[in-house]
A protein has these predicted regions:
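N-terminal glycine-rich phosphate-binding loop and ensuing alpha1 helix
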Residues: 14-69, 83
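Single conserved hydrophobic/aromatic residue that forms the stacking wall/gate
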Residues: 1-13, 225
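Residue-level signal for inorganic ion chemistry
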Residues: 18, 44, 99, 118, ...
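Acidic helix N-cap motif at the loop->helix transition within catalytic regions
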Residues: 69-75
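Conserved core of the sugar-phosphate nucleotidyltransferase
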Residues: 123-216
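Short phosphate-binding loop-to-helix
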Residues: 77-112
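Active-site donor/metal-binding and catalytic loop motifs
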Residues: 218-224
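Short aromatic-hydrophobic micro-motifs that form the base-stacking/packing surface
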Residues: 113-117
Length: 226
């Protein structure tokens, strides 16, 4: 263990992973959007603050290209918890895998909760964070979601409706996502590089590999990303 402190929910050790490897091409900037300055601070720092202020995490892992470490360090230097840096992978899921291995190498045990959040979603609330962690502790994993309000149409042939799913069964996924370290790391270790590269969603991957994924309550604002 990195620390003897117990914060938040009982004795479960909780480690947050901030994914910060994206390029942010939609904004037409040479600077990745998570590092754009807003009121004198990079966007990623607002995400970090939300989790620190929730008093739910014991350690922070930032997955980012090493060229940005010197830029980020002044914004995390005063945090009263351990901070580690993981290397980004070829895909989002490879980046997550790198972070999981780093956590294990620093004393992570199977029942630790790993909370994953995108660095460009700074509007997440403490309640959403809390509910996601609680859902993970009671199950194998959790993802913040909101109920779908619009009717969703399916088309397996491209042009005409082939099915209309029942709206009450549909949920839109957000971040954070939370996973029990042991089970989530294991399903990565048992898959090939190519299989991990094909993953399009962390919670979907957990579900398809047999983990029980709880749908925790999200918020409309949490859907907004910069």
């Amino acid at each position: 263990r990195d620390t003897d402190r117990s914060r938040g929910l009982g004795d479960v050790y909780k480690r947050q992973v901030i994914l910060s490897g994206g390029i942010g091409s939609r904004m037409g900037s040479n600077i990745p959007k998570q590092y754009i300055m807003v009121a004198g601070r990079p966007i990623i720092s607002y995400c970090i603050d939300k989790f620190v202020q929730s008093n739910e995490i014991d350690a922070l892992v930032i997955a980012l290209d090493k060229q940005w470490i010197d830029f980020i360090q002044p914004h995390v230097a005063m945090l009263q918890l351990p901070v580690y840096y993981a290397e980004p992978g070829e895909t989002r899921q490879h980046t997550i895998y790198n972070a999981l291995k780093l956590i294990r190498s620093h004393g992570g045990v199977d029942d630790d909760v790993v909370i994953i959040h995108d660095s460009v979603r700074p509007l997440v609330s403490s309640q959403v964070i809390h509910d996601c962690i609680c859902g993970c502790i009671a199950n194998d994993a959790a993802i913040a979601t909101i109920s779908v309000k619009d009717t969703i149409y399916m088309s397996t042939e491209g042009n005409c409706i082939t099915d209309v799913p029942k709206r009450s069964t549909l949920h839109a996924g957000q971040t954070p996502e939370a996973f029990k370290l042991g089970k989530y790391l294991k399903i990565h270790e048992e898959r090939s590089y190519e299989e991990i590269a094909a993953v399009t969603g962390g919670a979907e991957f957990a579900f398809r590999c047999g983990m029980k994924v709880f749908l925790s309550k999200g918020e409309e604002l949490s859907l907004i990303h910069i």
